[in-house]
Amino acid sequence: SLETLLGGLDSGRALAFASGMAAAAVVFQRLPVGSQLAIPTDPYHGVAGIVAEGERQGRWSVRRLDQADTASWVAAVAECDLVWLESPENPLITVADLPTICGVPRADATIVAVDSTFATPLNQQPLALGADVVMHSATKFIGGHSDLLAGVLTVSRDDLHDEFHERRLLHGASIGAMEAFLTIRGARTLGLRLERAQANAMELATRLEGHREVSRVRYPGLASHPTHEVAARFMSGFGAMLSFETTGPGERATEVCERTELINHATSLGGVESTMERRATIPGQERIPPTLIRFSVGCEDVEDLWADLDQALDATSARRRGAG
């Protein structure tokens, strides 16, 4: 079954949900009033919304931590009821020091959860590092074909499995039969797809880093990435997600996204097709650098992808110079 397959990938007991958000919500819903929780400064916007709503209602207090500030996360594990990590983080692609953070001794009631969507089970194993819960939006890389909604929680403890199973029933968050079938189909080719996509990502990140119209590239596989050494210590691969910042004003980044022909200008990610978008235009993402483009690298020919990126960057540069 789907849950047996997904549990095997993450080395735990898995529960499938109707979406990634449905899976994440179950974890936050278990917190009693007065809880303390820690989340990244810039988490997935749906998680940010859940946390902000509970904060407004007075349900919990929140620490928003820099993903790279390992000392603050270590302190949070000792003091909070829920520690929610997202690694690599969306959209800055920052990798948390999971071996250190997840290995901190903690109270039995404290839960350390990791959104591992960008890494997939093939690139990191949070449960083996000491996490209690791993969450994936299976809509993304596990499904891999941009044609389903699904989520998964994999846990290391039987009591959490039973609790989340009950909450899934109470909240009507069970996955549909067709979505379960499609997720199984996608998971069977995850290894092949990820191998190609992350090889493409490494090549494109390297080339973008040297492009005259790009001011910064964020990809854990690059030695220039702030958390490259952290990622290299425990990840099996660096994934297929990267982000880069164009030169010029923020609007120029939007134009680059609109100019591509092979790469889709879209918000979803993790499919066989490449997608990208300017994240600062998304509500709640105003703190993101204005020219940052999040790029989900697919399985197309890498030379075709590079030609598309290069022409979009050059075309918008020519217009900018002409306007000046």
Where are these regions (language model features)?
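A common structural junction motif
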Residues: 171-172, 259-270, 312-321
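Conserved PLP-enzyme active-site core in the AAT-like
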Residues: 14-213
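PLP-dependent enzyme catalytic core of the Aspartate aminotransferase-like
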Residues: 52-53, 58-63, 74, 98, ...
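Aromatic- and Gly/Pro-rich amphipathic surface segment
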Residues: 1-10, 18
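Conserved C-terminal alpha-helix-loop-beta "cap" of PLP-dependent enzymes
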Residues: 216-293, 297
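Short amphipathic alpha-helices in soluble, non-transmembrane regions
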Residues: 164, 254-261, 308-313
